[in-house]
């Protein structure tokens, strides 16, 4: 019985010693991240879709900050994200990249044919923004307001019941061009 307690104590002391060494090493040799990269990464939509030419949002943020990559390549984020990054970096806003511009006018969302869905959860695992809900062996559905249209859920589906469809434009989703209507400011005099 004494041998068991000695072994337990020895393993516990070794675990404590190695934990202390790892804790010290993590603080001593810590590498600080670039705060600009962190801020750009927070602005990006985190869809990890790869439409910008990078494998995810973090590598694209690093390329913008460190390599001077264009700020207009995020198709899911569109113009709103580009304007926020331009404001953060204090640079001139750029028109959307040609590839991104082609993708942004017709916003696409995933639609699941629920009659053919077998509930395998492969689409849920593939979705980077958790826009698909459902349980194992039950039909799944897409929350269209969260879907970025990244197309990552289509290929894993074994029954091919997922397709991307354009979102119908409404007054809320329409991109209004406010520069086409000239607006003149009329001074108002207040009389007391």
From Swiss-Prot:
Give the span(s) annotated as Hydrophobic: 1-26
Q: Which GO terms describe its cellular component?
A: plasma membrane
How does this protein assemble?
The complex is composed of six subunits: RsxA, RsxB, RsxC, RsxD, RsxE and RsxG.
Where's the 4Fe-4S domain?
Answer: 32-91
Co-factor(s): [4Fe-4S] cluster
| Localization annotation | Cell inner membrane
Matching entries from HAMAP family are given as: RsxB_RnfB (MF_00463)
Listed binding positions for [4Fe-4S] cluster 2 are: 117, 120, 123, 157
Family the UniProt entry places it in: Belongs to the 4Fe4S bacterial-type ferredoxin family. RnfB subfamily.
GO annotations under biological process?
electron transport chain
Function text: Part of a membrane-bound complex that couples electron transfer with translocation of ions across the membrane. Required to maintain the reduced state of SoxR.
Q: What is this protein called?
A: Ion-translocating oxidoreductase complex subunit B
The residues listed in the UniProt record as binding [4Fe-4S] cluster 3, with positions renumbered to this chain, are 127, 147, 150, 153
Domain 4Fe-4S ferredoxin-type intervals:
108-137, 138-167
Q: Which gene encodes it?
A: rsxB
Q: Which organism is it from?
A: Escherichia coli O1:K1 / APEC
Q: Does the keyword Amino-acid biosynthesis apply?
A: no
- What's a Gene Ontology MF term here? metal ion binding
Highest taxon of source = Bacteria
| Highest classification ranks of the organism | Bacteria, Pseudomonadati, Pseudomonadota, Gammaproteobacteria, Enterobacterales
The record's Gene3D superfamilies line, in alphabetical order, gives: 3.30.70.20, Electron transport complex subunit B, putative Fe-S cluster
Q: What is its main location?
A: membrane
Q: Which SUPFAM superfamilies match?
A: 4Fe-4S ferredoxins (SSF54862)
- Family annotation (PANTHER family): ION-TRANSLOCATING OXIDOREDUCTASE COMPLEX SUBUNIT B
């Amino acid at each position: 019985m004494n041998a068991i307690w000695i072994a337990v104590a020895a393993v516990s002391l070794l675990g404590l010693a190695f934990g202390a060494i790892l804790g010290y090493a993590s603080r001593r040799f810590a590498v600080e991240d670039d705060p600009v990269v962190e801020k750009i990464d927070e602005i990006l939509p985190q869809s990890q879709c790869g439409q910008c030419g990078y494998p995810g949002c973090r590598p694209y943020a690093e390329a913008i900050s460190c390599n001077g990559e264009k700020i207009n390549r995020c198709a899911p984020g569109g113009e709103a994200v580009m304007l926020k990054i331009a404001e953060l970096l204090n640079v001139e806003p750029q028109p959307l990249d040609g590839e991104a511009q082609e993708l942004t006018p017709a916003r696409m969302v995933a639609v699941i044919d629920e009659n053919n869905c077998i509930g395998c959860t492969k689409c849920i695992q593939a979705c980077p923004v958790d826009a698909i809900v459902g349980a194992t062996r039950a039909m799944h559905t897409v929350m269209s307001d969260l879907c970025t249209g990244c197309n990552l859920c289509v290929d894993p589906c074994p029954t091919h019941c997922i397709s991307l469809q354009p979102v119908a434009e409404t007054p809320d989703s329409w991109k209004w061009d406010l520069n086409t209507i000239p607006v003149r400011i009329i001074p108002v005099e207040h009389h007391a």
